[in-house]
Amino acid sequence: MRFDNKVVVITGAGNGMGEAAARRFSAEGAIVVLADWAKEAVDKVAASLPKGRAMAVHIDVSDHVAVEKMMNEVAEKLGRIDVLLNNAGVHVAGSVLETSIDDWRRIAGVDIDGVVFCSKFALPHLLKTKGCIVNTASVSGLGGDWGAAYYCAAKGAVVNLTRAMALDHGGDGVRINSVCPSLVKTNMTNGWPQEIRDKFNERIALGRAAEPEEVAAVMAFLASDDASFINGANIPVDGGATASDGQPKIV
């Protein structure tokens, strides 16, 4: 198995893509550390995985003190960290005028600070194992969206941080890449009105949203030795959404 006895830390593991990634890495032999602010949800996911092969951590990734403590405790308890999956994220809709300073602080705290803090404090351990980082960015980090200014800014930061960290640490054997999903079927998006989901599906060449497991498969690929020469890549997992130049479909 590709991750036999490797230690994989996954943030935002209580649902959606993070939960799917936890199940994928676990199925491929990893010991998974599931980090999430939602204690009940992350405990439930951990309890559903093989006994002794999953550890749940209740954490706010925007708290750098808590993040440093978590990474050090994981490395001390499990002996190593091989993979960090920075998946925790939040979204607040609206333009810069429509959203508040608190909205920005919330998005920046989780979507940017969380990635920076987790990477910073995992890297000393990843350097020892020649491990890797996979960030969850977004197609919203590759181009702009209407009514999602802060989210686009945050995910754009993750995209370029991925490139910069790949340059800084690739020479030391640590690869850093990201996945850039479009619409994914999650607890949040499944509750959207059908007409909104239909608009997304019209922009996706495959005509549908991604299953969380489809994104998790790409995360696992990027973290595996199968991707040993991929570094600094931001991979769209979008059903062809970014293949378009933005002009309308008229045929």
UniProtKB/Swiss-Prot annotation:
Database matches in Gene3D superfamilies: NAD(P)-binding Rossmann-like Domain
One Pfam family linked to the record: adh_short_C2
Phenotype of gene-disrupted mutants: Knockout of the gene causes the accumulation of the intermediate product acetoin inside the bacterial cells.
InterPro entries: NAD(P)-bd_dom_sf, Sc_DH/Rdtase_CS, SDR_fam
Annotated signal sequence range: none
Temperature dependence: Optimum temperature is 40 degrees Celsius for oxidation and reduction reactions.
CDD domains, per database record: SDR_c (cd05233)
Coiled coil: none
Active site residues according to the UniProt entry: Y151 (proton acceptor)
Binding of NAD(+), residues: N15, M17, D36, D60, V61, N87, Y151, K155, V184, T186
Record note on pH: Optimum pH is 8.0 for meso-2,3-butanediol oxidation. Optimum pH is 5.0 for (3S/3R)-acetoin reduction and 8.0 for diacetyl reduction.
EC category name: oxidoreductase
Assembly notes: Homotetramer; dimer of dimers.
UniProt note: domains: The substrate-binding pocket is formed by two protein molecules. When compared to other Bdh enzymes, SmBdh contains a shorter alpha6 helix, which provides more efficient entry and exit of molecules from the active site, thereby contributing to enhanced substrate turnover.
Physiological role: Catalyzes the NAD-dependent oxidation of meso-2,3-butanediol to (3R)-acetoin, and of (2S,3S)-2,3-butanediol to (3S)-acetoin, with much lower efficiency. Can also oxidize several primary alcohols such as glycerol, 1-2-pentanediol and 1,2-propanediol, with lower activity. Cannot use (2R,3R)-2,3-butanediol. In the presence of NADH, catalyzes the reduction of (3R)-acetoin to meso-2,3-butanediol, of (3S)-acetoin to (2S,3S)-2,3-butanediol and of diacetyl to (3S)-acetoin. No activity is detected with NADPH/NADP(+).
Protein name per UniProt: Meso-2,3-butanediol dehydrogenase
Gene this chain is encoded by: budC
